[in-house]
């Protein structure tokens, strides 16, 4: 098996949670998002439920235009945000006080196309669009790290 070096492009956002065991149940809370909480009967189940709860609330609130607190709290338990949700959150944060129409004009796309970029249920930007957004906002939406993967040999 040969190893090939490739670059992995990803968007990563994590919120950290607390786990508290009480009466055989693991309770999960997100200090940065006090209205997001859940539980599980095992640590693994609690963290799976945390991922579902976190992403469900973030997707719902982002698609409705509700401001989202960015992660500040750090603990042992990190919960990843789905890439489409993280992208929509960071795009909205970077837009700041600019209107969607202003940014759409800079991208040379329609206002409705830009609205879809900020909606986690609809966002599906091309790499070209992401590259343009990175220039407009001077912000790296995507990171890349070299990773070794086995090269496929038939």
Describe these PLM feature segments.
Residues 48, 89, 93, 116, ...:
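DNA-binding alpha-helical recognition surfaces that contact promoter or target DNA
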Residues 97-116:
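Short alpha-helical DNA-recognition segment
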Residues 72-97, 142:
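A short, Lys/Arg-rich alpha-helix, primarily the initiator
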Residues 143-154:
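Short, charged recognition helix plus adjacent turn
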Residues 1-65:
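DNA-contacting interfaces and partner/effector-binding or oligomerization modules
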Residues 119:
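Short, conserved catalytic or interaction motifs in soluble domains
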Residues 126-143:
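DNA major-groove recognition helix of helix-turn-helix/homeodomain DNA-binding modules
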Residues 42, 99, 125-129:
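Residues that mark the N-terminal boundary/hinge immediately upstream of a DNA-recognition element
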């Amino acid at each position: 098996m040969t190893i090939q070096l490739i670059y992995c492009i990803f968007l990563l956002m994590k919120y950290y949670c607390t786990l508290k065991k009480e009466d055989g149940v693991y309770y999960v809370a997100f200090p940065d998002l006090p209205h997001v909480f859940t539980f599980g009967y095992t640590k693994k189940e609690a963290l799976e439920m945390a991922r579902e709860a976190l992403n469900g609330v973030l997707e719902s609130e982002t698609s409705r235009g509700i401001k989202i607190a960015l992660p500040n709290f750090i603990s042992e338990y990190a919960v990843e945000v789905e890439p489409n949700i993280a992208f929509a959150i960071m795009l909205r944060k970077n837009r700041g006080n600019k209107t969607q129409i202003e940014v759409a004009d800079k991208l040379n796309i329609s206002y409705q196309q830009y609205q879809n970029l900020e909606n986690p249920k609809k966002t599906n930007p091309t790499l070209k669009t992401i590259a343009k957004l990175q220039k407009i906002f001077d912000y790296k939406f995507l990171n890349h790290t070299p990773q070794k993967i086995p090269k496929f040999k038939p």
